[in-house]
Amino acid sequence: MRFMKNSTTNNTKKITVAVVGAGAAGLMAAGTAALQGAEVLLFEHNEKVGRKLAITGKGRCNVTNNCDMQEFLAHVPQNPRFLYSALGAFSVQDTMDFFEQQGVPLKTERGNRVFPMSDNARDIVDALFYWVRKCGVTILREEVTEICAEENGITGVMAGGRKHNADRVIVATGGKSYPLTGSTGDGYVWAEKLGHTVTPLRASLVPLVSPDKDCPRLQGLSLKNVSLTIFENNKKLHEGFGEMLFTHFGLSGPLVLSASSHMRKWDKASYRAEIDFKPALDEAALDKRILSDFSQELNTDFRNSLGKLLPRKLIPIVVERSGIDPHQKVNSITKKQRQALVRQLKHFEVAISGPGPIRDAIITSGGVSVREIVPKTMESKKVPNLYFAGEIIDVDAYTGGFNLQIAWSTGYLAGYHAGQEIKQ
């Protein structure tokens, strides 16, 4: 009964809530506030709502991650404790139930990632759009230029050249990533003008740039079931397992994007990556495997002997890095040479010079400080009746549906509390 409309009582005053931004958090906040009995104005400067949402998950929309709260929070490296109340108020199961109730059947895939059965993100956007309309939300395709506040708190927003009065305002403008979808970063500017601390913004869940000359040669090579280790100042920082991709500028893919969220000291630390192409085998077992392969190709040139072990595109690079003459016959390769080959297969180094640009990031790390937001309501501690939801808050997570769940949960909590009637 979470989404039943509340009725207004005689000793309360119906209020107006302005929601800025019609992304995941803003749509959830707007509909939820309307169901509390508020008149809701949803401002979106794009022609269509949910533009960024429509391209998430490569157009499939990874709606959430079907795991319990403790596992969920383990995937939130930045301020996880802030989310206890939000996830308690609107859980992963609540998200799944919500979309099923809106007529969007879901499925759970590897890694507990939840997608619409149709594999079409547009179904999620359309369901939210029709839901907020059904809830009575007024959608205004106008660009908000200012959040209006006086000494006692919020008074409204400036949009379309005029002031729209509002008792409460929810800022759900997202981050600075994917600017082509309309992300401008305006919300951070408004928050600072209203006295909030905005922690430094940077790209997160972003490809990594490498000066390594081998990356362009390996461009387009996709690898599955590999291990990636990131070193910060030569100390092991993070290790992950999964899929990755070589690009003309460096590294990308889910494994790399998740690793990037751990790399937070670009201004004062150096980073490098090591790829283990055969993580299921330790060095001794891999050496045995290589010996077995070699025994079947004794008179073959070394460069032609690795076809069963590696993708074709990778072989010339590994041969070069091993230091073994590509024309040397397999039957003359020494144990020391095999050890050099094993090292390349288990510790393939890639230099990292920096993250990709913030415009290419899936999310923006940093944002309005959680110390200045009430975690049980999402209301500002600085400005009464001002609320925040979604990516604008200084909370971010790994790939896998976690960031969208944060948007649903914080959006719900902000909408629920902002929509409560004022007692007379």
Describe each region flagged by the PLM:
Residues 16-42, 414-419:
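N-terminal Rossmann-like FAD-binding beta1-loop-alpha1 element of flavoenzymes
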Residues 140-153:
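A conserved short coil-to-beta-strand element within the FAD-binding core of flavoproteins
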Residues 13-15, 159-168, 239-240:
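Core beta-strand elements of the Rossmann-like FAD/NAD(P) dinucleotide-binding domain
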Residues 140-143, 316-396:
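A glycine-rich dinucleotide-binding beta-alpha-beta segment and adjacent secondary-structure elements
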Residues 18-20, 43, 144, 164-179, ...:
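Short hydrophobic core segments
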Residues 34-58:
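Glycine-rich FAD pyrophosphate-binding loop
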Residues 60-108:
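Glycine-rich active-site loop/strand segments that organize a redox cofactor
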Residues 47-55, 63, 69-70, 105, ...:
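An anion/pyrophosphate-binding glycine-rich loop and adjacent beta-alpha core
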